[in-house]
Amino acid sequence: MTHLLIVDDEQDIVDICQTYFEYEGYKVTTTTSGKEAISLLSNDIDIMVLDIMMPEVNGYDIVKEMKRQKLDIPFIYLTAKTQEHDTIYALTLGADDYVKKPFSPRELVLRINNLLTRMKKYHHQPVEQLSFDELTLINLSKVVTVNGHEVPMRIKEFELLWYLASRENEVISKSELLEKVWGYDYYEDANTVNVHIHRIREKLEKESFTTYTITTVWGLGYKFERSR
């Protein structure tokens, strides 16, 4: 269920927005206080509707605090500020949309529905490139480069490195690597992963790439992580 935070110092606006969005199936948290809104900021919030003109803490302040906390929450401003420079400033802060009062609650619902649909499409697009300092992995062409210089790798070596790197800092078992990269059971050839990881390490070390490494976590598997 999508969690929406509505912040507006006008209680009637908060109430009507809450009614419309709950009818659409949203989980809705509301507040009429910008100060309280800051205390509600968290990764649990999927999207926000913010007024701008509020006493003490305004809608701009909330977004600046969100960025200070390194939270990435999409937000739409709902405001009576109608001048072009207001809209431009809001968009400069990163607003995903800008709705001027008086407004249609149904239109606001549709705007947020459309925004979330676009976000889902974006997040479901396959990642085609990974970068870790000087190291770059390009999935489409199965190419690995260090400082722009191509590192020759066999297909399975690339696929193994890609799988580990795309799950950075996660310990991945040998059986999972065999299943996902080679497509067969662990017991068929337990040494396959060891051999390929040894080759990958050698090739990266030959290019003097040492800022990231594939660490052996004894008894558990392997982890791609920044070197300690």
Swiss-Prot record:
The keyword Phosphoprotein appears for this protein: yes
GO BP terms: regulation of DNA-templated transcription
Domain called Response regulatory: residue spans: 3-116
Processing and modification events after translation: Phosphorylated by SaeS.
Keywords carried by this UniProt record: Activator, Cytoplasm, DNA-binding, Phosphoprotein, Sensory transduction, Transcription, Transcription regulation, Two-component regulatory system, Virulence
Gene3D superfamilies (alphabetical): 3.40.50.2300, 6.10.250.690, Winged helix-like DNA-binding domain superfamily/Winged helix DNA-binding domain
UniProt induction comment: Autoregulated. Transcription is affected by Agr and SarA. Also, transcriptionally repressed by NaCL, pH below 6, glucose and the antibiotic clindamycin.
GO-annotated molecular function: phosphorelay response regulator activity; transcription cis-regulatory region binding
Localization terms from the record: Cytoplasm
Main location class: cytoplasm
DNA-binding span(s): 127-226
4-aspartylphosphate modification, residue list: 51
Pfam families reported for this sequence: Response_reg, Trans_reg_C
Top-rank lineage group of the source organism: Bacteria
Gene Ontology CC: one annotated term: protein-DNA complex
Entry-linked SUPFAM superfamilies: CheY-like
Function (record text): Member of the two-component regulatory system SaeR/SaeS involved in the regulation of staphylococcal virulence factors in a strain-dependent fashion. Probably functions as a transcriptional regulator via a specific DNA-binding domain, recognizing motifs near the promoter sequences of target genes. SaeR/SaeS activates the expression of exoproteins involved in adhesion and invasion of host cells, including hemolysins (Hla, Hlb), Coa, DNase, Spa and cell wall-associated proteins (Emp, Eap, FnbA). Acts probably downstream of the Agr system in the regulatory cascade of virulence factors.
PANTHER family: REGULATOR OF RPOS (PTHR48111), RESPONSE REGULATOR SAER (PTHR48111:SF2)
Protein name: Response regulator SaeR
Originating organism: Staphylococcus aureus (strain NCTC 8325 / PS 47)
Lineage of origin: Bacteria, Bacillati, Bacillota, Bacilli, Bacillales
GN (gene name): saeR
